[in-house]
């Protein structure tokens, strides 16, 4: 019998560098609301909750530079710097707050 567990993932040793070669942009974000706001790894940051105060124009087409499936939580009154990277692939964005619903490049 094998010692492997079904569905088990055994990663190689060492560090995995995320978003290698992508432009990284740092943005200062403040939560002006009275509730925490959580933003996921692949959320179009430009469309994030309106209680988050930041330069939205420079975040168009960008997402958080964090591992897939994770998120950053912004507590009320807190200000923090986050790192963003551009979406890649087809660069089509649908849903979120319905501000784009199409190509990020047109």
Curated annotation (Swiss-Prot):
EC number(s) given by UniProt: 3.5.1.5
Keyword Hydrolase (UniProt): yes
GO biological process: urea catabolic process
Recorded catalytic activity of this chain's protein: urea + 2 H2O + H(+) = hydrogencarbonate + 2 NH4(+)
GO CC term (a single one): urease complex
Top-rank EC class of the record's enzyme: hydrolase
Subunit relationships: Heterotrimer of UreA (gamma), UreB (beta) and UreC (alpha) subunits. Three heterotrimers associate to form the active enzyme.
Database matches in HAMAP family: Urease_beta
Family to which the UniProt record says this protein belongs: Belongs to the urease beta subunit family.
Name by which UniProt lists this protein: Urease subunit beta
Gene coding for it: ureB
